[in-house]
Amino acid sequence: MIAPAPITLEGSGVRLEPLTLAHHDGVAAAAADGRLWELWFTSVANPEDTRGYIAEAVEGQRAGHMLPWAVRELATGSIVGSTRYHDISPQVDRLEIGYTWYAATWQRSHVNTACKLLLLTHAFETLGCRVVGFRTDNFNFASQRAIEALGARKDGVIRHHQARRDGTVRDSVMYSILAGEWPEVQRHLATRLARHADETH
């Protein structure tokens, strides 16, 4: 596996731009669409904490265990969310996709499918990952449904796993896609995007 480096990924109406402080206002505005920070089981920062949120992500990138992006929707030119590679482990050819959130206006749109197709294609076909993982809070049922809709398989639940922002400790629901499963998942995601395109024209 090649160690991930900052890169712009674009396709299906979205562009993933390496996250920097230049995205501050766009990220803050996207989080404000739906007041996403009020969902206690998410990783979305209060707009007042956006600078620290971005700085933490960039520091993770420098340390080599994280690669964050801002998500830009191309038809509007707006920043509509953020996502990351994290827990990057070249020793076992594995990384995870997470810290993903979208402005309320863009939830249940083509954006998540388009982003996941870009991220998974890059992970499997460019970086050479053997497995891509996902994790989510046991109470974040929308996230669990979204991950399962991608075609990821549920590996299990790690109990008492991670601290939430409010100080409580969550159970983490773990999912993964293996390299051998990627061609089928890729076809599935491409079909979903084609169906969305047909419905919007």
Regions picked out by a protein language model, each given a short descriptive name:
Residues R135, R153-G167:
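Conserved catalytic-core motifs of GNAT/GCN5-like acyltransferases
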Residues M1-V111, H122, T126, T168-H201:
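GNAT-family acyltransferases
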Residues F134-Q144:
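Conserved beta-strand-loop-alpha-helix junction that forms the acyl-donor binding cleft
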